[in-house]
């Protein structure tokens, strides 16, 4: 569970709801018609932008914003160095006995053990990276589309409410409440866009970048093992993938 995503979502809504309660009754901020326009309208408009597979596939990818935990690059480097040492001592077949928890790393090692040359291994791993990145980009795009559409649907709902209000001006006392209800759709659209959809899209983009970086690290490590490079050289080379802070920490140790 990603604590930052969960805390951000709950905390953001908690403060907004608290402000509503302090400003008056929470009931004045609830309107079922406005919710239907923003939520229902957004779903079907976004559905028009994507295929059914891309739309519903985004719900699976969305779980990565809350549940996904990327492998730490230093842990991947340590595992690759361990495998490089084993390969130098016992050959590539010795890698079959090692426990590998990362599926992409396992795929690369399987290609080595099967005896494929470096070009085949590189091409296969690059293709895997590209296709995974494409799937994640599509999933992120769905949530960005929701973030774009929700405020627009909110504005449409507000315009609908204003038209209904202006068509019935007989009772001046009803104008204020009618205007408040009309503005609720804009509020709902802004809340969903800026507190749900765009933050999830940004977190998914971060996850995608982290996963792509890790996979490139693994690919370079697997190819270095295949090339028979010294484990120390591999370790030094792969540490270029670490950020400056972690690299400095590694040097100090």
UniProtKB/Swiss-Prot annotation:
Statement: the UniProt record of this protein carries the keyword Cytoplasm: no
Listed transmembrane segments: 6-26, 28-48, 146-166, 180-200
Keyword set, alphabetical order: Cell inner membrane, Cell membrane, Chemotaxis, Flagellar rotation, Hydrogen ion transport, Ion transport, Membrane, Transmembrane, Transmembrane helix, Transport
Subcellular location: Cell inner membrane
GO biological process, one term: chemotaxis
Residue ranges, Cytoplasmic side: 201-253
GO CC field: plasma membrane
Annotated membrane topology: Multi-pass membrane protein
Transport found in the keyword field: yes
Principal location: membrane
Role, per record: PomA and PomB comprise the stator element of the flagellar motor complex. Required for rotation of the flagellar motor. Probable transmembrane proton channel.
Protein family: Belongs to the MotA family.
Oligomeric form and interacting partners: Each stator complex is composed of 4 PomA and 2 PomB subunits. 2 A subunits and 1 B subunit are thought to form a single ion channel, so that each stator complex contains two channels.
Name of this protein: Chemotaxis protein PomA
Gene: pomA
């Amino acid at each position: 569970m990603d604590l930052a995503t969960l805390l951000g979502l709950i905390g953001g809504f908690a403060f907004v709801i608290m402000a509503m309660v302090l400003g008056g009754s929470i009931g004045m901020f609830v309107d079922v018609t406005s919710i239907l326009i923003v939520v229902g309208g957004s779903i079907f408009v976004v559905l028009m932008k994507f295929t059914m597979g891309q739309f519903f596939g985004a719900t699976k990818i969305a779980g990565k914003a809350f549940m996904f935990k990327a492998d730490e690059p230093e842990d991947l480097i340590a595992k690759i160095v361990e495998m490089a040492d084993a390969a130098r001592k016992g050959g590539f077949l010795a890698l079959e006995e090692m426990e590998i928890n990362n599926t992409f790393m396992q795929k690369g090692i399987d290609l080595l053990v099967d005896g494929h040359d470096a070009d085949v291994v590189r091409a296969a791993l690059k293709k895997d990276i590209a296709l995974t990145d494409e799937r994640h980009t599509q999933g992120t795009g769905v949530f960005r589309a929701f973030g774009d559409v929700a405020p627009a649907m909110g504005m449409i709902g507000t315009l609908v409410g204003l038209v209904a209000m202006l068509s019935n001006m007989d009772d001046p006392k009803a104008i204020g409440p009618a205007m408040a209800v009309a503005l609720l759709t804009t509020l709902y659209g802004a809340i969903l866009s800026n507190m749900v959809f765009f933050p999830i899209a940004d977190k998914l983009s971060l996850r995608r970048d982290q996963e792509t970086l890790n996979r490139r690290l693994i690919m370079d490590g697997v190819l270095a093992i295949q090339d028979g490079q010294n484990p120390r050289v591999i370790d030094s080379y792969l540490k270029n993938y670490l950020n400056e802070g972690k690299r400095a920490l590694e040097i100090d140790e």
